[in-house]
């Protein structure tokens, strides 16, 4: 019999589960305030849904052995978008939904086998919202949600913002057949590969400068406007940054704009972003999101409301940030109920029911005690902080 969990997954102790619940409820309270309604997408989906029309590589999906192609969800956006385009298609737009649940990310382990990473996520999706107004709401909600967590971080988190339209600007003079090669070099910051491409196409040497042009949004937008005047995407980003800057300052978040930033999954076709915190040994992405209109359209939505955008926090990664676990985890008063040899388990259960009716947490020790002093010794062993004695 196997005594260890599968590669990539782990058991959570009661304190970790409680902390996950606290973080999830803190996020959910903000989502509800903003008018978002909870949904529960399935963990198992058809592969064509999980791949989001080719936006997610099938190698990132954990497949199930079944009569039809099924898999475990690597993220929740595709499942919720499917529901929004089918079961919820007649509901009024904008449609605001939030969800929480486990996602399963498949990756190649060091020894060559499949490693499944199981993570708890909690996020929102906004359907049928057009224009920069939708991005204004979504990123404002991200800020408000993170602020509600009140995490004691030693360094300010960084909100990294990109836009697929910026990459299109950078590559607008590159032959379309060469876009994938140049895009990979820029997004992966691969200077050597980019230099090799430029050696054969020297007219694109200017692309090298964009590998180093990331940082304060105002400065980056100014550089982009010099290179690409009157680009509509820059006007949208300017409006977005002007709104976010004061919010970021009050929330303690640093903003960074990167024209070459592209997310892990190719879901997005507009604004993209990720929130990065300092972890124990390296930076940790605790939230990511963006706009995914194309995915919604591939799932059958049509017309002006065929839009979608959202974000998701990784609750497990939030919990594991330095100081985040110990700060707000509260200890609930727990009562240990012990009974003497002259009493019975039935009497102890009746006494426990009375405490439960008062809303008190109480557990019964199944074995009678010879003395109350013995019960007090069991109290320390049980991890409870008060004793209820049934006896003489």
Swiss-Prot record:
Domain of life: Bacteria
Record keywords: Amino-acid biosynthesis, Cytoplasm, Histidine biosynthesis
A GO term for molecular function: histidine-tRNA ligase activity
Keyword set includes Amino-acid biosynthesis: yes
Pfam families linked: tRNA-synt_His
Compartments, as annotated in UniProt: Cytoplasm
Cellular component terms per the entry's GO annotation: cytoplasm
GO biological process terms held by the UniProt record: histidyl-tRNA aminoacylation; L-histidine biosynthetic process
Keyword Cytoplasm belongs to the record: yes
Pathway: Amino-acid biosynthesis; L-histidine biosynthesis; L-histidine from 5-phospho-alpha-D-ribose 1-diphosphate: step 1/9
Additional detail: This function is generally fulfilled by the C-terminal part of HisG, which is missing in some bacteria such as this one.
UniProt function note: Required for the first step of histidine biosynthesis. May allow the feedback regulation of ATP phosphoribosyltransferase activity by histidine.
PANTHER family: HISTIDINE--TRNA LIGASE, MITOCHONDRIAL-RELATED, HISTIDYL-TRNA SYNTHETASE
Subunit description: Heteromultimer composed of HisG and HisZ subunits.
Stated name of the protein: ATP phosphoribosyltransferase regulatory subunit
Organism name: Synechococcus sp. (strain WH7803)
């Amino acid at each position: 019999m196997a005594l260890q969990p599968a590669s990539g997954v782990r058991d959570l102790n009661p304190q970790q589960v409680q902390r996950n619940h606290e973080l999830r409820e803190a996020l959910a309270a903000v989502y509800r305030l903003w008018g978002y309604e909870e949904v529960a997408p399935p963990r198992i989906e058809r592969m064509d849904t999980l791949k989001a029309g080719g936006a997610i590589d099938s190698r990132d999906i954990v497949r199930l052995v079944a009569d039809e192609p099924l898999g475990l969800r690597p993220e929740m956006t595709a499942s919720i978008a499917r529901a929004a385009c089918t079961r919820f298609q007649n509901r009024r737009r904008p449609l605001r939904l939030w969800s929480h649940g486990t996602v399963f990310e498949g990756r190649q382990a060091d020894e060559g086998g499949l490693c499944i990473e199981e993570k708890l996520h909690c996020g929102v999706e906004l359907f049928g919202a057009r224009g920069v107004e939708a991005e204004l709401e979504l990123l404002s909600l991200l800020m408000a949600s993170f602020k509600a967590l009140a995490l004691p971080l030693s360094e300010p988190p960084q909100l990294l913002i990109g836009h697929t339209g910026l990459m299109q600007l950078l590559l607008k003079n590159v032959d379309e057949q060469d876009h994938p090669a140049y895009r990979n070099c820029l997004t992966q910051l691969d200077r050597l590969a980019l230099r090799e491409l430029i050696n054969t196409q020297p007219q694109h040497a200017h692309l090298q400068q964009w590998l180093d042009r990331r940082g304060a949004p105002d400065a980056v937008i100014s550089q982009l406007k010099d290179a690409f005047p009157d680009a509509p995407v820059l006007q949208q980003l300017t409006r977005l940054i002007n709104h976010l800057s004061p919010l970021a300052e009050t929330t303690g978040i640093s903003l960074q704009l990167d024209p070459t930033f592209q997310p892990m999954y190719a879901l997005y076709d507009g604004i993209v972003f990720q929130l990065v915190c300092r972890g124990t040994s390296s930076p940790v992405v605790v939230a990511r999101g963006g706009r995914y209109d194309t995915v919604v359209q591939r799932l059958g939505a049509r017309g002006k409301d065929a839009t979608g955008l959202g974000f998701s926090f990784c609750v497990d990664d939030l919990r594991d940030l330095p100081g985040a676990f110990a700060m707000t985890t509260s200890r609930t008063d727990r009562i240990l109920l012990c009974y003497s040899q002259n009493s019975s388990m039935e009497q102890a259960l009746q006494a426990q029911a009375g405490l439960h009716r008062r809303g008190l947490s109480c557990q019964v020790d199944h074995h009678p005690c010879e003395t109350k002093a013995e019960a007090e010794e069991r109290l320390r062993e049980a991890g409870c902080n008060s004793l209820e004695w049934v006896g003489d």
